[in-house]
Amino acid sequence: MNTQQLAKLRTIVPEMRRVRHIHFVGIGGAGMGGIAEVLANEGYQISGSDLAPNPVTQQLSALGATIYFHHRPENVLDASVVVVSTAISADNPELVAAREARIPVIRRAEMLAELMRFRHGIAVAGTHGKTTTTAMVSSIYAEAGLDPTFVNGGLVKAAGTHARLGSSRYLIAEADESDASFLHLQPMVAIVTNIEADHMETYQGDFENLKQTFINFLHNLPFYGRAVMCVDDPVVRELLPRVGRHITTYGFSDDADVRIESYRQVGPQGHFTLSRQDKPLMTVTLNAPGRHNALNAAAAVAVATEEGIDDADILRALAGFQGTGRRFDFLGEFPLEPVNGKSGSAMLVDDYGHHPTEVDATLKAARAGWPDKRLVMVFQPHRYTRTRDLYDDFANVLSQVDVLLMLDVYSAGETAIPGADSRSLCRTIRSRGKLDPILVSDADTVPETLAQLLQADDLVLVQGAGNVGKVARKLAELKLQPQKKEEEHHGR
């Protein structure tokens, strides 16, 4: 952003008083890094710490941020404020030093709320679909020339970044319910895609508590704001009478205000019509597969229609939508001859979905778009508690693939729970007689194991939220070819 654009922005969004240097503890996370990127572009001095470099820290370094790959007290001593992610423990030396120095320590969502405070905020909440819906809304507003600021939990591929500072009053942000921190936000428009039992440790294991928290979030809207809610989701539908704000519903349901009709999928694209109250029928080509993405698009269209964005801009944005990182992310199609000597090729897709509902949506999209392909999944369960709580659901959905390679559970810092591990899950799936899962304890051996199994026209889905994305990128880099053993490499 140039000086003239920043000056224009300052007429809308004033600077934070007495804040010059902002330090982020855990800056490499997508949500943290996105906020840091926006603030860096606004002209604030940014520093942060994390355990290892990644694309987020590299991007921030390129913007002039100071990044430390260690946590030390001296990192924070010049800071005006310290921003922390929920992954950071209370005894972190930087947090301890900040408190001793009486430097304000705030959560990520509080800083996001500050960014939103003087803007027209659009917050996207829900158990599934937040990242893609946020990207779709951002793409439509950008196509319409509204130059929004956006802060997303995943890479917006068209922009090549998780976040971007725009010069207008619009801020589009993913709202995180995992730690209930979305209650800090006070948007003008709020989308709720769906509500399922996830992150229940935050809500004391009480689903009613989770539902009430979503109600409280929606009541952060001003009385003239608008809630955009997916009426297909039974929990969202149940909550409608309790929401004391203007509501637009969307979905496949007959009573939806924005209704999806005549959906069909051809390869990676969805084709459908949208009926809207007092508006012409909209014929949509969506460059994203699956009925779940049609729902995400309907939410984005509902918001854009309410804002008065021209239908032509909406349709262009959806037809040209480039997707988000690790959401049915097509990494290539590779010939099998150098992999295992077979003819034909195999497709490689990377997907972040780690809840049974998300995995099921990915599988349905794959089956609908490529009905003749064999589905080969490399799956990494995420968290022992989630595996335990949704054990039967995981067993059911994973039994739908044709070939299953399962990595060990990505613990995310949790202690192992007996019976909620990958070996147990493989055993349960095997006992159902539909397929024989392969437990892969060493992720480095995935290319070699896959090479023995792959056939022409396979679709390989690398699925999960832990570090399995690195496996997907490695497979793409290797073009699915197994790595040569050291002795072969040296000609022994």
Curated annotation (Swiss-Prot):
Matching InterPro entries: Mur-like_cat_sf (IPR036565), Mur_ligase_C (IPR004101), Mur_ligase_C_dom_sf (IPR036615), Mur_ligase_cen (IPR013221), Mur_ligase_N (IPR000713), MurCDEF_pg_biosynth (IPR050061), UDP-N-AcMur_Ala_ligase_MurC (IPR005758)
MF annotations from Gene Ontology: ATP binding; UDP-N-acetylmuramate-L-alanine ligase activity
BP-aspect Gene Ontology terms: cell division; cell wall organization; peptidoglycan biosynthetic process; regulation of cell shape
Reactions catalysed: UDP-N-acetyl-alpha-D-muramate + L-alanine + ATP = UDP-N-acetyl-alpha-D-muramoyl-L-alanine + ADP + phosphate + H(+)
Binding residue positions for ATP: 126-132
GO cellular component: cytoplasm
E.C. number(s) listed in UniProt: 6.3.2.8
Pathway(s) where this gene product acts: Cell wall biogenesis; peptidoglycan biosynthesis
Stretches of the chain forming a coiled coil according to its record: none
Alphabetical list of HAMAP family matching this protein: MurC
Function of the protein: Cell wall formation.
This protein's name: UDP-N-acetylmuramate--L-alanine ligase
Upper lineage: Bacteria, Pseudomonadati, Pseudomonadota, Gammaproteobacteria, Enterobacterales
